[in-house]
A protein has these predicted regions:
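Short, basic (Lys/Arg/His-rich) helix/loop patches that form interaction surfaces
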Residues: 19-22, 78-83, 95, 146, ...
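Proline-centered turn/helix-capping motifs that create local helix->coil transitions or kinks
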Residues: 40-49, 112-115, 121-128, 161-187
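C-terminal secondary-structure termini that scaffold catalytic or DNA-interacting sites
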Residues: 114, 125-143, 147-152, 158, ...
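Basic, Lys/Arg- and aromatic-enriched nucleic-acid-binding interface segment
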Residues: 22, 26-28, 41-105, 112-113, ...
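Generic recognition of well-ordered alpha-helical segments
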Residues: 11, 30, 34, 150, ...
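Catalytic-site neighborhood detector that most strongly recognizes the C-terminal catalytic loop/helix
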Residues: 59, 67, 123, 234, ...
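N-terminal core-binding DNA-recognition domain of tyrosine site-specific recombinases/integrases
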Residues: 1-44, 202-210, 224-230
């Protein structure tokens, strides 16, 4: 403990920026502060390394957020149809799921009769530790049930019908435990129940492999490279363009604040600007 310096504490918090919600980072900040305060009170350390560390909620700059124009989306999907990850990409564009929510999607979360998809867990591969980690959705509000579009329903039904011929690896015999954010109880993710399994390996595809594959597809489609989260941004943008109310979109995306929905995920496109001018023209008073 005596070797820990303020710079080490800051590094821990900064490393969480990309993968964790601001509330989770803040809770880590508080826990670290409490731990070192107790260590100092018990004479285990002479100086409190968190004294000079201040918590600042991470804010993503609008310029860092990428989304596809309608033309880019069409070109991308045409190329992606020939790839083994097409269903994953298409489903995010139809539902706005986060990558971890899509990877952790299990069949018990899909109701074909009611045509809904419930988000109640996530799954990601930790490369440094070399293991799969199940967890709760990003925030309390991220728990949600999403009505399926016709296309989303078709994608999931097609995967379900093909599943009996799916290759399976020993990894699928595992059951991962995690804490339910709403109740504090232990929940379980049965790996064999995952919707998306790589047909060649019989395992779920790792988070980073999706981005690597996306870059290749972007080159083929001759569009600017983007990462998986851009598909979620694109879903939000298309929804607003189609007239979905921001408050409704907030619920579909699982945001705690309407401000997050508007500031971070909704973009003004040239198409929507043209449409706004046409609407203004049609309502002009002569």
């Amino acid at each position: 403990l005596s070797d820990v310096k303020p710079m080490h504490c800051k590094k821990v918090l900064l490393s969480m920026d990309a993968d964790y919600a601001g509330s989770t980072i803040r809770q880590t900040y508080i826990t670290m502060g409490t731990m070192f305060k107790a260590a100092k009170m018990n004479d285990l350390i002479a100086k409190h390394p968190m004294d000079s560390v201040r918590f600042t909620k991470p804010v993503r700059a609008p310029d860092d957020i990428h989304f596809l124009t309608r033309d880019e989306q069409i070109r991308f999907l045409e190329v992606a149809k020939r790839s083994h990850n097409y269903n994953q990409y298409a489903l995010i564009l139809e539902t706005g799921l986060r990558t971890g929510e899509m990877i952790g999607l299990t069949w018990d979360a899909i109701d074909f009769e009611k045509r809904t998809l419930t988000v109640n867990k996530t799954l990601e591969y930790r490369h440094k530790q070399h293991f799969w980690r199940a967890g709760p959705p990003k925030t309390q509000q991220s728990y949600r049930t999403i009505p399926l579009t016709d296309r989303a329903y078709e994608i999931l039904k097609e995967i379900k019908d093909k599943r009996p011929w799916q290759k399976e690896s020993p990894l699928l015999s595992q059951t991962l435990e995690y804490i339910d954010r709403r109740t504090g109880a232990i929940s379980r993710l049965v790996m064999r129940d995952l919707v998306f399994i790589n047909w060649r390996t019989g395992e779920p595809a790792k988070n980073s492999s999706y981005d690597t594959h996306l870059y290749k597809l972007c080159d083929e489609a001759e569009i600017e490279k983007f990462c998986m989260h851009a598909l979620r941004h694109t879903y939000a943008t298309r929804a607003i363009e189609c007239g979905v109310q921001p408050k409704v979109l907030q619920k579909l995306l699982g945001h705690a604040s309407i401000k997050t929905t508007m500031d971070r995920y909704v973009h003004v496109t040239s198409e929507s600007l043209d449409q706004a001018v046409r609407q203004f023209e049609s309502g002009r008073v002569s």
